[in-house]
Every structure is written in C-alpha cells, then in structure tokens.
C-alpha cells in the first residue's frame, strides 16, 4: 500500500503517538518532540522555522517561496495554496505521490486546541476556516484522503472511525 500518515496537531493526536511505524509519516511544526519516527516535518509559518530543532534524519518542508538551505519547498498551483501547516502537510503527501493519506489529529469543528498550544504566542483560536474546509473537501473528493476521528467534523466526507483505522493499520 502506497500510504502515509499525516499528523495534524489537534488533541486527538495524543491517541496515536505510540502507534508502531508502518508507513511514511508527515507531521507539523513540533511533531518530532512527541513522535520521533516522523519522516517529514512541515512548517507553514516562516518565522516559526527557527524554533524547530532539526535532525539529519528528517526532511523539512515549507510553503512555496520560502525554501532555504535546510527547508525544502512544497510546490502547488495557486488553487491549492495551503493555509496552515496541516493543509500544507496534506499537500506534501500529494506532492510525494501517496495514493492513500490517513490524517490523524485533525479535530476541526470539534476542538480549537493544539497539543502544542503552550508553544504558540497566540491564544487558542478556531483551527479551520470555511476556505480550509472547502480545500480539504475538494482534495478528499478526488483522492483517497481519510480523516480518522470518532467525532463529526466540519467536512462533507464522514471521518473514518478510529476502530476501522486500527483494523486497517494492523493493530
């Protein structure tokens, strides 16, 4: 299976931190501090990149137009411009050619918290906008992108229940 896991930073991420590694893993911002097996780290905000410690065993990615010696660039057409680290991570999974993308830790419409909230300067705020939801809905319509969550979220496509993901994942 040409699949990957994409880790968003919602509270449900904590439920997946001890999963054994089976697929390529893409995470956002400080993910390495809580899950060392991640392969790719994505950061949307250019000013935050200097706060993320780097390892020689990981690949670091940023949005279009912000690459550096240690940060590679995720390329996308204007219609697919990501608006946060989570959507940027999904866009990277698409760029890398994964046919199945499992999204873990996405709690849009259920929680506005981040597992890294104490590291951010701003207070907790709504993690999604209508345009972010429409973008994810558009991507999920034509591709095998599965949001794993037991709650009803903001998307048109229903989330995959956690038990179903666990069965497919082989636990």
What does each model-found stretch correspond to?
Residues 1-171:
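Metal-ion/cofactor- or nucleotide/acyl-coenzyme-handling active-site neighborhoods
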């Amino acid at each position: 299976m040409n699949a990957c896991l994409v880790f968003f930073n919602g509270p449900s991420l904590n439920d997946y931190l001890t999963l054994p590694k089976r697929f390529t893993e893409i995470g956002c911002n400080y993910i390495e501090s809580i899950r060392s097996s991640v392969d790719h780290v994505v950061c949307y905000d250019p000013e935050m990149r200097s706060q993320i410690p780097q390892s020689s065993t990981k690949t670091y990615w940023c949005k279009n137009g912000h690459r550096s010696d240690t940060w590679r660039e995720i390329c996308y057409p204007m219609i697919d411009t990501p608006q946060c680290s989570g959507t940027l991570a999904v866009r990277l999974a698409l760029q890398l050619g994964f046919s199945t993308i499992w999204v873990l830790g996405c709690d849009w419409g259920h929680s506005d918290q981040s597992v890294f909230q104490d590291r951010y300067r701003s207070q907790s705020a709504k993690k999604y906008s209508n345009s972010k939801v429409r973008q994810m809905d558009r991507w999920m319509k034509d591709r095998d992108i599965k949001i794993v969550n037991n709650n009803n979220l903001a998307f048109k496509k229903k989330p995959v229940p956690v038990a179903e993901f666990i069965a497919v994942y082989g636990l």
